[in-house]
Amino acid sequence: MAAEKRVFLDISVDENLIGRIEIRLFVEDAPKTCENFRALCTGEVGMTPNNKARLHYKQNEFHRIVKKFMIQGGDITEGDGRGGFSIYGRYFDDEKFKLKHSRPYLLSMANKGPNSNSSQFFITTAAAPHCNGKHVVFGEVVKGQNVVDYIDNLAVDDKSKPLAKVLISNCGELVKKKKPLKTDEELAAALEEKNNNARDNEIPKCPKSWLYRDDDNEKKHEMRNDKRREYRSRRSRSRSHEKNRDYKKENRGDSSRSQPRRDENGITVRGRGGVRFRRERSATPEHWRRNAPTKWVHDSHKHPEEDLV
């Protein structure tokens, strides 16, 4: 969406200022035509190529007034309707004939035929359907309609030229002003007033986060927590029982456990079970005796001469 643009025309009659006309340009519908008119209001382009005239509406006349139809001006080269010059050259082409001349106070381009737009324009003072499809509508008067009506009621000659001298004494582009920044004291006072006027119903509710749980989920969550607490309680009790058992084992006064076990011969016995063997040397079993060798092995390997020594 194109930014809205507005221009103004200060009008004087016989060197007496009568008021200002403010015009809103239809930039979206006719951007090229609007830019031509805006630049001619500001005079930013400079002079025509032959330096004959300045590309500016300032001190330009409304040279034609047709009662109950329109007021016409913008001839920056001749001043009588025979000239004109655009910021694009002598002429430029027509844009879309989208908007109709359906009411008064519409801004439209004057021309000499198709694609002959220059700097001349007119403002309607009544509906003009016969201009549809021939002239491009590109703006409307938003303030100063009474000034347009005043010009429309001026006396004219037989060629529709006003008898009084109607001039554009000044013109330009309107720029929307930014609001001035407040001082620190004003900002503090405004903030304090805003806080004092705050109401409970104006405070927005806290948004639901991903941690939010509705009633059903909250009940399930509580049940899970109860189970966890019960499990932890049982586990804690079992651990306390184990600690108590270990403590009793370590501190009970049992003489049988405080002294090592010994057998009948006084030898220390390890382990918990009873003794299953005898520690003293027993007699060699008979079957071992029968199978015992009668001659030692190392004696059989002696040299025969060793016995003679």
Swiss-Prot record:
The keyword Isomerase applies. One of its GO terms (biological process) is protein folding. The keyword Ligase does not apply. PROSITE patterns: CSA_PPIASE_1, CSA_PPIASE_2. Residues 217-229, 239-265, 280-289, 296-309 have a biased composition (Basic and acidic residues). Keywords: Isomerase, Rotamase. One of its GO terms (molecular function) is peptidyl-prolyl cis-trans isomerase activity. Co-expressed with pdi-1 in the syncytial hypodermis. One of its GO terms (cellular component) is cytoplasm. Signal peptide: none annotated. It catalyses: [protein]-peptidylproline (omega=180) = [protein]-peptidylproline (omega=0). Disulfide bonds: none annotated. Belongs to the cyclophilin-type PPIase family. PPIases accelerate the folding of proteins. It catalyzes the cis-trans isomerization of proline imidic peptide bonds in oligopeptides. Thought to function as a catalyst in the folding and modification of cuticle collagens. This is Peptidyl-prolyl cis-trans isomerase 9. It comes from Caenorhabditis elegans.
